[in-house]
Amino acid sequence: MLALGAVATLAACSSGTTTAADSTSTTTSVAREAGPRVAVSYEGGLRVLDAATLETVADFDSEDYTRLNLAGDGRNVMVTTSQGFQVLDTAAGTTDEPVLTDTVFEAQKAGHVVRHGGKTVLYADGTSDTTIFDTAALESTDGLPEVESIPGVEAHHGVSIVLEDGTFLTTVGNANGRTGIEVRDTSGAVIARNDQCPGVHGEGTAQNEVVVFGCENGALVYDKGEITKLDAPDQPYGRVGNAYVSETSPLIVGDYKDDADAEGSLLHAVTVIDTATKTLEVVQMPEGAEYTWRGVSRGPDDKAYIIGTDGAVHVFDPTTREFTASYPVIGEWEGPTEYQDAHPGISITGDTAYVTEPDTDGIHAVDLTTGDVTVSSTLDITPNEFVAVTD
């Protein structure tokens, strides 16, 4: 087992990077302003939009299905491909042209991307290996930055995170299932472990570096060396699968599913996990509104903003456990057959939420201080995953 301080792979090592096959690009004549960008995936390609106008800045060929995650530096996006994690430079905050770079962090079944404490952490489901690098190094390095590699034990769909003091948290599982997490110090020694989290999935870090992992029957909370299991009110199945966090709030908003046999991806309740009091509560969505894992984001005042099947963005205050406002944005929609299928999502930067509407190939910008739609655009592609990128 490699300690976190050990450098396992260097940027100069040619084995750590590949060249994306047949990646072609198109840039537009739209005048570029130095501001935020929106990166959008669609079948067979990637699109970069000017966040202020929602006009196309650049377009790139890619694979039929890719996932997008912020790299954490306010400029780059990690594109999950069959080769690994490919770096898309959106040029956010500059007047440069976006570039789908040849920089690829190779990974078998590339999975979760976590950003915390100046580190970006990549997880390979096919090996359970974890790759860690300084987030800022993406902008200062031509090609792969220096990385730390933590070998996995048994392959599973998992996630890892590194805290600011070097403490390493990672999920535990194998081909038969996932059971919990373990925590290691900087020497690689296991200092805490919990195997009472069936189907462990999703990770979020709240205020004071308290970390939450979702379980099929509740959640695990790691706080300063101790792991606490929080039971869901519905047993034996009450699944928290994704954590939506603000690092300035002790309250984590999670998704929630109480029927293991329910088909599709639509959900009708959220959870509030108080990392200070170590409690978990379930709150029902407003009547007539459901959502998916793609439809939740934290925003102004540490509130959660949820795009519902009724077409409205619902504002949820985790402090009061109440929905406080509803902003109509798009038409009503139905849940996807498969979770990968294109369906509405939300991404927030500052006071602006971006909402996709695949049924109309649309994307909309919403002023969260007023609820007004400020800009709308109809694309010539159907948006799937997307992220708003700001410097």
Describe the residue ranges of each PLM region:
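Long, acidic/polar, low-complexity amphipathic helices and coiled-coil-like
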Residues: 93-214
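Repeated scaffold domains used in trafficking and secretory/extracellular systems
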Residues: 24-30, 62-76, 102-119, 149-165, ...
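Acidic, serine/threonine- and glycine-rich low-complexity intrinsically disordered segments
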Residues: 175-295
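C-terminal motif of bacterial Sec signal peptides marking the signal peptidase cleavage site
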Residues: 9-12
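A short beta-strand motif characteristic of beta-propeller blades
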Residues: 52-61, 92-105, 139-152, 188-195, ...
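Short beta-strand elements that form the blades of beta-propeller/WD-repeat-like
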Residues: 33-42, 69-87, 113-132, 160-175, ...
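Blade-level signature of beta-propeller repeat domains, shared across WD40, Kelch, NHL, RCC1
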Residues: 356-391
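Bacterial signal peptide processing site
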Residues: 14-17
